[in-house]
Amino acid sequence: MEKSIFAVVGGDARQIALANMLAAEGITVYCSGFEHAAASLIGVASTDPLTAVLMAETVILPMPPTRDGETLNAPLSTYRIALNDEFCAALRGKIVFVGIASKLREVSPGYAQLNLLDYYANESFLLRNAQATAEGALAEIITHYPRTVCGSRVLVTGCGRITRFLAPMLARLGANVTVAARKPTDRSWAVSVGLEALSFPKSLRKAKEFGIVINTVPAPVIDTKWIDALSPDALVMDLASLPGGVDWDTCARRKIKAIRALGLPGKYSPETAAEIVKETVMLILEEG
């Protein structure tokens, strides 16, 4: 079987764009899990998940591969794609690319024995994906916040890759941006690029001042105390991977608008997101 035969199974609009890009380069591509958007596929063969995997040597699964630990992350599928022993067996002997491979290994011991290559572990991928996520977060703010970004008080919690793209971007649009970070070195970075910086305890004491609160920390940092301290017309956005870091029940009790903003590259920039995955996959294959 030729290495030029790929399977793209599950995922959102970025996986559709990825399949189309591969096919446009003359690569044979089998797809599954895109029934709700089948008309968007160009030059690829649509089939069931097992057939797609069995026909290919290289399989590309989404990021994350699962949200419930039992089925493939396939929001565009008309049916649940079970991550059962049969699907696992079909993947044996294949080169399997996946975003956040640990999520798949946790499903069952069989998945831990597969040849899984994690494109999410590639630093170039992470940086470019963070940039796309930051732009998507800006789109969500513009969509859901009733005021302009310019002049708004914004708090961004955490100081990872997404924050380092998003916080300066918002500041360039005229927002007054504060970064809440645990490490003194992260707070020093924020100050060095012209932002305000606070520890988490100090940011809590100023919570009522912020109109927009954006969490990037996958831990319960925007908790009940935090939500109770916010202005009632604040917007809370959680960019952190599940389970996130926002107390949703308290947001609902206080009727504070809160958004769980996951998969933003796939929602707002699927073609760029697909290019990032494709280039990362091809680089890993070339490097052997």
Predicted regions: what they are:
Residues 2-5, 93, 150-153, 233:
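Phosphate-coordination loops involved in phosphoryl transfer and adenosine-cofactor binding
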Residues 6-17, 22, 150-171:
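Glycine-rich adenosine-cofactor-binding loop
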Residues 12, 33-35, 102, 182-184, ...:
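Residues in the short beta-alpha loop(s) of Rossmann-like NAD(P)-binding domains
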Residues 25-41, 173-193:
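NAD(P)-binding Rossmann-fold cofactor-contacting core
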Residues 43-51, 196-203:
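Short acidic-hydrophobic, aromatic-tinged amphipathic segments that line or gate anion-handling sites
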Residues 61-151, 280:
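Glycine/serine-rich phosphate-binding loop and adjoining beta1-alpha1 elements at the start
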Residues 64, 68, 80-93, 193-266:
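Rossmann-like adenosine-cofactor binding region
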Residues 95-119, 239-285:
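Rossmann-fold NAD(P)-binding glycine/threonine-rich loop
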